[in-house]
């Protein structure tokens, strides 16, 4: 069984209401059934089942806060639903929580900067659990120094040719879509763009860190 969370239903009512409490209880049931029984098995294997993404998508976990037109649930959803989600998943397994929610550091960039065509292409399959998205920022030469990013992207007709390396990418070995921070302009943060790279793109490779 999962121990009680730090914030219980009926308390801290300044921020939490019945909607948050109901979500917490439903999510706790999901975690107890789909995560807790398998944690030791996944720890030994060094990874958790990809099937969990699909189950989380069907449950509605991955679409929390994303527009309904992309298959998400945004009406009545606020930041505290997200806090509840992080708490309850972490109660089951912190590593699973970090990987399962890697979409929340990648899809927001597509939501904010992408075209409608890109949003329709990438967001629905990720929040449905059919595809996995991640964010690539950290580089071997400078960590997460965004202003100092060296990975370059040069336009070539209708495409960009990207040269560089990223590391420490959450869900990096199993993702289908990579939102990569690249330098397309001058020095500093103003010269950085976010480009979606799909797994299987010619010249793209993944190497596990061991």
Pin down the residues of each PLM region:
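Hydrophobic, small-residue-rich alpha-helical packing segments that form membrane-like cores
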Residues: 142-145, 160
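Mature N-terminal segment immediately following signal peptide/propeptide cleavage
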Residues: 17-27, 32, 38
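C-terminal helix-coil-helix/basic helical segment that borders enzyme active sites and/or dimer interfaces
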Residues: 36-47
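A structural signal for short hydrophobic beta-strand segments in well-ordered beta-sheet cores
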Residues: 151-154
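Internal helix-loop-helix
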Residues: 58-130, 170-177
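Intrinsic disorder at enzyme termini
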Residues: 1-22
């Amino acid at each position: 069984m999962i121990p009680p969370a730090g914030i219980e239903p009926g308390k801290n009512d300044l921020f939490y209401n019945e909607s948050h409490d109901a979500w917490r209880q439903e999510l706790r049931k999901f975690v107890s059934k789909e995560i807790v029984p398998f944690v030791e098995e996944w720890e030994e294997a060094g990874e958790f089942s990809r099937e969990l993404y699909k189950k989380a998508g069907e449950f509605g976990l991955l679409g929390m806060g994303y527009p309904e037109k992309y298959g998400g649930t945004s009406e009545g959803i606020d930041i505290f639903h997200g806090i509840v989600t992080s708490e309850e998943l972490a109660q089951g397994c912190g590593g699973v929580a970090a990987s399962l929610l890697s979409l929340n550091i990648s899809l927001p960039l597509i939501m904010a900067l992408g075209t409608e065509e890109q949003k329709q292409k990438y967001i629905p399959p990720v929040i449905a659990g059919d595809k996995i998205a991640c964010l690539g920022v950290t580089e071997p030469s400078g960590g997460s120094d965004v202003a100092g990013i060296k990975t370059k992207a040069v336009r070539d007709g209708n495409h960009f040719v990207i040269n560089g390396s990223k590391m420490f990418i959450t869900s990096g070995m199993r993702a289908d879509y990579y939102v990569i921070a690249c330098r397309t302009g001058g020095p500093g943060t103003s010269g950085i763009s976010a480009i979606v790279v799909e797994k299987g793109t010619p010249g793209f490779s993944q190497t596990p860190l061991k």
